[in-house]
Swiss-Prot record:
Descriptive protein name: Protein-export protein SecB
Domain of life: Bacteria
GO molecular function, one term: unfolded protein binding
Subcellular location per the Swiss-Prot or TrEMBL entry: Cytoplasm
Gene Ontology cellular component terms for the protein in this record: cytoplasm
Principal location: cytoplasm
Gene it is expressed from: secB
Species per Swiss-Prot/TrEMBL record: Aeromonas hydrophila subsp. hydrophila (strain ATCC 7966 / DSM 30187 / BCRC 13018 / CCUG 14551 / JCM 1027 / KCTC 2358 / NCIMB 9240 / NCTC 8049)
Length: 156
């Protein structure tokens, strides 16, 4: 019986324990006069992810979206959302675990964060803001390539 257990492959484990809003901020510093201007915004999106180890195989992933909208030189609004999730991830080798935490989990969190940003902007009486989907897999691959290039440069 013990040999049967040892011969079985250990299966990867992935569970979403919880998805929640960790922090929200919305500022419209130049209202109400900004509403009188022609709406030709310059919208800038910054993203960041952070991972915290909560317990063995339990991780908190926090996706931060910061949206800055300007009309010419004036800030129309600044919106920041931290969307978080607690994930159980077990039996994954390090390269796949890193990919899961940096790409797969943010892919799960992004629609929630995008909805929160859209709701805040609408409640601020600004035109609806629909953020485009993000390819976190491509961002992860780009980050890994940059890290390898920096390591190669440091070793040379």
């Amino acid at each position: 019986m013990a040999e049967e257990i040892n011969n079985q492959e250990v299966q990867p484990e992935f569970h979403i324990q919880r998805v929640y809003t960790k922090d929200v901020s919305f500022e419209a510093p130049n209202t109400p006069h900004i509403f009188q201007k022609e709406w030709q915004p310059d919208v800038k999106l910054d993203m960041d992810t952070k991972t915290n180890i909560l317990a063995d195989s339990v991780y908190e992933v926090v996706l931060t979206l910061t949206v800055t909208c300007k009309l010419e030189t004036e800030t129309a609004f600044l919106c920041e959302v931290q969307q978080a999730g607690i994930f159980t991830i077990g039996n994954l080798p390090e390269p796949q675990l890193a990919h899961c935490l940096a790409a797969f989990c943010p892919n799960i969190l992004f629609p929630y964060a995008r909805e929160a940003v859209s709701n805040l902007v609408s409640k601020g009486s600004f035109p609806q803001l629909n953020l485009a989907p993000v390819n976190f897999d491509a961002l992860f691959a780009q980050h890994m390539a940059q890290a390898q290039a920096q390591q190669a440069t440091a070793e040379a």
